[in-house]
Amino acid sequence: MRPTRCCAGCSFDAVGDGAAKKATGVIQKYRGRALLVATGSCAINCRYCFRRHFDYGAENAAKGGWQEAVAAIAADPDIDEVILSGGDPLSLATHKLVELTDALRQIPHIRRLRIHTRLPIVLPERVDDELVYWLGSLPWPLAIVVHANHANEFDASVDAAMARLRGTGAQLLNQAVLLRGVNDSVQALQDLSERSFAAGVLPYYLHQLDRVEGVAHFEVDDTQAKALIAGLTARLSGYLIPKLVRELPGDPSKRPL
């Protein structure tokens, strides 16, 4: 049962996933890209999750052996990038991921694969020999977008996992969420950018909080967010500055702030 609405301006579907449904477990918001909800499972419960009310039971691309999801992508030649998301796709057994990508290999218009995952940060042991072999065998240029919000999430085991991922030829990027009381200072953001880059991960996005029900206490207003980026820009090289963005339903891309 969904909770009673308690946040003015909040929503159970803050980013418009429902309206962007292309098939069971397939979401397409932006031209040329399709997001495949591979699973509803995650290694941890992120309290600010924008899909906290998402119906993973009904909207799971693994249902029916991926057939509906893969067919929907195959039927649209404008899709040249597939994003594996969830949940966390790396929470699936590697043989299930092989099954999925074997099906995607049959689609000639796919040119890139992207994986959104938090597991290399919170469970670096997941980056094992079998996973590394699978990643290295993929036929597409690969981007792995990890998710760390604070420099303290990195340690030697995470560094080792990132080194193994880089060894597959993947481009490693980090996306973070700006969270009140967690990383809402210039110093915290600087530490995060520097620490992620030291691990071989390029800062990518700093998301403004998606206003889903139950997370408003983490919100940082846009004025402060922009001031934080200005402060960060005064301290760091440009390649260490993540893009400050907000996702709004119906927009053709993430909205820069």
Report the location of each language-model feature.
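Flexible, acidic/Gly-rich N-terminal and inter-domain linker regions that tether
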Residues: 1-28
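N-terminal pre-triad scaffold of radical SAM enzymes
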Residues: 21-50
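Conserved catalytic-core segments centered on acid/base and nucleophilic motifs
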Residues: 36-37, 82-84, 89-90
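Short, flexible loop/turn elements at secondary-structure junctions
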Residues: 40-42, 88, 119, 150, ...
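Iron-sulfur (Fe-S) cluster-binding segments and ferredoxin-like electron-carrier domains
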Residues: 49-61
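Surface-exposed cleft-lining segments at the edges of enzyme active sites
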Residues: 56-57, 86-87, 115
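Conserved AdoMet/S-adenosylmethionine-binding subsite of the radical SAM
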Residues: 67-81, 90-236
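C-terminal accessory regions of radical SAM enzymes
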Residues: 227-257
